[in-house]
Amino acid sequence: MLLVNWTEMDNPKLQNIPDEGTLKALSKTIGNCAFSLGVELDVDIAEIESTMYEFKKDMFGQNFDILRKWQTMSGGGKTIRTLMHALWIVDRRGFDFLKKTYKIV
């Protein structure tokens, strides 16, 4: 299993909040992982289930809705770093996409 050295990824860009355009593009990059991603991002289970019901046959819609719900939840921590950490666990393509998008070494 590959590991990420998060101390080496101490780039100031990681503290930024991802914009909606990036989240839309990301939602089309990642696979069928909306439920797992929502759990990793601490989205309420009822909200995740609501998304799964509302976007039954729309994987990209599920992904984007989970990302949007995460971004609009109260509290801090809606950073690129938090999102990358969750994506490292559930979908490496999304992790690689954010690394490339934000030019993080």
What is each of the regions a protein language model found here?
Residues 15-17, 21-22, 35-105:
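Alpha-helical death-domain superfamily interaction modules
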Residues 1-9:
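Disordered regulatory segments flanking catalytic cores
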Residues 9-30:
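Extended, non-catalytic structural segments that build the interaction scaffolds
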